[in-house]
């Protein structure tokens, strides 16, 4: 929206059972690069919230051979720099820049992150650009937490994340033994759209017990005082990191077993698909600043959206400015709202109305 870039989406493969998007397929990235030779960069989200990793080395190589930069959203990959047996980190793969959310798995305070730059990126120029979009009066509290966390990981990171990985693997085995749940892991790896998997991520598919992920999330919080990372349409994610202990994992496993016994249903009426291919009509910047009007949600079908709509977490847009609103998207929004998902982005916080472009179909 701010810079006027026009995105070219490389739609990921979708796991039909889990209903989640996977990584970027090499051939699809190569196709997009070939069809858009004037593009300046390839942006990769690696790993995904669920722990899915793309073939980052290959994607970086393709981007560089085409004269493009490779930028990596590595928000959930802080620990890749410190753990043996974990997927390759963005910098190790040769990426030009990577944003790393230290507060997610590194132990720093919420909102604190690092922007890593490669040898071909001018750090001074990057700093100038950052100063255009954020405060020049940085929080020393946040910066101190970053430095303390960095020191802790530099000294003990490998040991810490080895323990985290062991806890996650143990939890997967125990949860899968309950029946009805599927805590997925490295068995998803196929060498392409799932090139690797972050074994510290404890993602659990819940639809086979007849409950949406967000419903299990709510039950864990309200009935068992267990706060996990998030629940979506068909899965939950328990984010294990440096502050977790084995007894907390045991509590989670026991609670999931009891939830299955107490709340299992036949699952009728549940949606399973999490990702909907976007239909881009115009650039995000043009759509965001264009003339617009507000319409009741169901009257927006076929119109071009001028705002973001997303479930948060994980914060992946269901709609972005410039994308066409379809019946499938509207069904998804209404279903997610009914199940209790936290929806953000639109001007109307209740999402009873959406802003759409005037005069554009």
Task: Name the predicted role of every residue range.
Residues 170, 176-345:
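Conserved C-terminal alpha-helix-loop-beta "cap" of PLP-dependent enzymes
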Residues 7, 70-71, 228:
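Hydrophobic beta-strand scaffold residues
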Residues 149-172, 248:
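Structural signature of PLP-dependent enzymes
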Residues 89-128, 134-145:
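Active-site PLP attachment segment
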